[in-house]
Amino acid sequence: YLAGSLPEFPGIPGSTLPTSLSVPSFQQKRLLFNRLGQPGQVHVYRADCRAGDRIRVQMLVPVLPVGGAVVPAFAVVAHSLPYSADVHKLPFTLPAGLSAVVAPPPTELVTPVADALTSVRYYPGPTIDTKTLVGGRAYIVVWSPHNHMGKYVLQIGNRWPMRWTYWAQIPLFWWQIRGWFGLSRAAAYLALAGIVGLGALTFAALRGRKRAKRDAE
């Protein structure tokens, strides 16, 4: 489920639309790993969109070994969305000309899902799937209506990465995601030790073969 999404670990976004944190795109599949670190904190991300661009956002609630996750609300804000819902639930007053779709926190989390690549677990949360009617700047707003703190994950976008460089970085992504979840990365050390050991055996075998060839001559 997480494979195909570019993981990003941004800094703390601003809490208003003018101070929002820029994201390269809301179209390419990305995973935003972040944390609400204070009661009442609001995170706002922004990206430029064209008319007709699809904006898909899903909240993922991480299952952490020692707790510390949060189940926040989130919203998509932009000019002239096809529909607007629950705007009054936003943590700030919306400027004129903007519309929003708000996804409140789920009432319950039923069954966690395990990611096949990293073995991390998370609860799939609500999804907003909309599109922009006009070009301009769009925003994703994250906050906790109950002033809770903790880690959260946003999966945004719908376009799969096509560059080979993404797939070449899968081991790095595995390392980063496991570390953010607070899970063991011992498997990476074992794999590295195995590669080093295999390389040493191969090198020794080649040296032995060359030595035997010289002795035969």
Predicted regions and their residues:
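C-terminal edge strands of extracellular/lumenal beta-sandwich accessory domains
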Residues: 2-19, 45, 66, 72-84, ...
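Selective for proline/serine-rich intrinsically disordered segments
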Residues: 5-8, 22, 89, 93
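Short secondary-structure boundary micro-motifs
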Residues: 17-20, 29-32, 113-115
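Non-catalytic, beta-strand-enriched accessory regions in extracellular/secretory proteins
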Residues: 23-49, 54, 59-65, 73-74, ...
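Short, conserved acidic/polar surface loops in the N-terminal third of protein domains
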Residues: 57, 69, 85-88
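A short local loop/turn or secondary-structure capping micro-motif enriched for an aromatic residue
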Residues: 64-67, 92-98, 149-150
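Alpha-helical transmembrane helix bundles of large polytopic membrane transport and channel proteins
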Residues: 76-103
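Extended, solvent-exposed segments with strong compositional bias
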Residues: 94-131
